[in-house]
């Protein structure tokens, strides 16, 4: 579709002001496992007008939990400071994922804007990220993640699309309390 849409811009069917991209996880843009470093990825990077990457340390709190939780040197902290330290590491993980994509694109000697097209934190969950899982989901952690990410992206002039404004209850049809329905900053209940 990227090539098709770029051709439509060349033909004047679409305005040249429309930016064309593909939006996917930072790993898919070459920021993680080297198995993604392929000729096809290089061709995609060359074809898009900008890269739109996703970074979700919220999911990593369960699936790749090395960064998550209280470090030994933080065990004597007050609970609030423990949480703030953990959430700072979550934001730093997003930053490192972004920088890994930048480094990969630079290694190809390609110059493209790189935006964070999706990043967010769920406020609630009753399975993997709730009380019986990583304990990542709650409103305070969501607020801290947004604050830390905004500070970093503003300081570095990086476009960040925070996912998302409103909870989407329809996303968890079989489990209304699941995390995917609770990424919104505003609860519609």
Question: Can you describe what each PLM-predicted range is?
Answer:
Residues 1-115, 122, 126:
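Noncatalytic carbohydrate-binding groove/subsite architecture in carbohydrate-active enzymes
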Residues 114-118, 161-164:
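Short beta-strand segments at enzyme active-site cores
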Residues 126-189:
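Aromatic-rich peripheral "rim/lid" segments of glycoside hydrolase catalytic domains that contact
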């Amino acid at each position: 579709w990227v090539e098709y849409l770029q051709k439509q811009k060349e033909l004047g069917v679409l305005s040249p002001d429309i930016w064309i991209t593909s939006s996917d996880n930072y790993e898919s843009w070459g920021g993680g496992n080297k198995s993604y470093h392929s000729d096809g990825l290089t061709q995609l990077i060359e074809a898009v007008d900008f890269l739109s990457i996703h970074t979700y340390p919220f999911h990593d709190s369960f699936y790749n939990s090395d960064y998550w939780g209280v470090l030994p040197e933080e065990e004597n902290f007050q609970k609030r400071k423990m949480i703030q330290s953990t959430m700072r590491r979550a934001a730093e993980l997003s930053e490192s994922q972004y920088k890994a994509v930048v480094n990969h694109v630079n290694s190809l000697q390609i110059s493209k804007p790189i935006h964070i097209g999706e990043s967010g934190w769920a406020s609630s969950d009753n399975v993997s990220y709730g009380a019986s899982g990583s304990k990542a989901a709650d409103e305070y952690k969501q607020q801290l993640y947004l604050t830390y990410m905004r500070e970093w992206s503003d300081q570095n002039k990086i476009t960040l699309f925070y996912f998302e404004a409103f909870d989407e209850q329809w996303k968890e049809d079989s489990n209304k309390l699941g995390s995917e329905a609770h990424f919104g900053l505003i609860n519609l209940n």
